[in-house]
């Protein structure tokens, strides 16, 4: 069995915003393509609100939804009630697990993951949901790709600059255990 590789995947505005009223405050088709390319064929783990914002399971991936609502059901998805259950269940089936939101799952897993895939949006946005602050000195930036949106997705209808950034946890910083 291959070791499980646990990663966070998020799009984050310059001011830390990741959402507003349970939606993304921007529209970046290239970021959605990037998300799909990274996660296709793997397991994605999300909270119930993230699932609700998407509105369906994402095809070509094992969708795991973490919720405290014991009566929650989602067609074609695996529903669990703790993060530990999600990691235990999927850890036996897939060598790459992606935490895709929301804020609470990001907070719970930031100390556990080995890799961060961040789309860093080079602009502030109004929002009510934020990515947790993390100590960048615990991470090594392994890649950065600069992009500018084609459309009118930024403030005042201007193109939006964003970067696809990958961070790996430094070897001297051990991920935390779940127990």
PLM region descriptions:
Residues 3-5, 10-173, 179:
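Flexible, gly/pro- and Lys/Arg-enriched active-site loops
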């Amino acid at each position: 069995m291959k070791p499980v590789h646990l990663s966070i995947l998020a799009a984050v505005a310059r001011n830390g915003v990741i959402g507003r009223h349970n939606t993304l405050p921007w529209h970046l088709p290239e970021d959605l393509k990037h998300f799909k390319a990274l996660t296709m064929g793997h397991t994605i783990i999300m909270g119930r609100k993230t699932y609700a914002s998407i509105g369906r399971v994402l095809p070509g991936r094992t969708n795991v939804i973490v919720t405290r609502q014991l009566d929650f059901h989602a067609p074609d998805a695996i529903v669990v009630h703790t993060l530990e259950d999600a990691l235990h269940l999927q850890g036996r089936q897939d060598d790459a697990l992606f935490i895709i939101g929301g804020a609470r799952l990001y907070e719970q897993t930031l100390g556990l993951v080995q890799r961060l895939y961040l789309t860093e949006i080079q602009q502030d946005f109004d929002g009510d949901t934020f990515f947790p602050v993390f100590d960048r000195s615990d991470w090594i930036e392994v890649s950065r790709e600069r992009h500018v949106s084609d459309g009118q997705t930024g403030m005042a209808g201007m193109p939006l600059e964003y970067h696809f950034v990958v961070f790996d946890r430094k070897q001297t910083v051990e991920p935390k255990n779940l127990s």
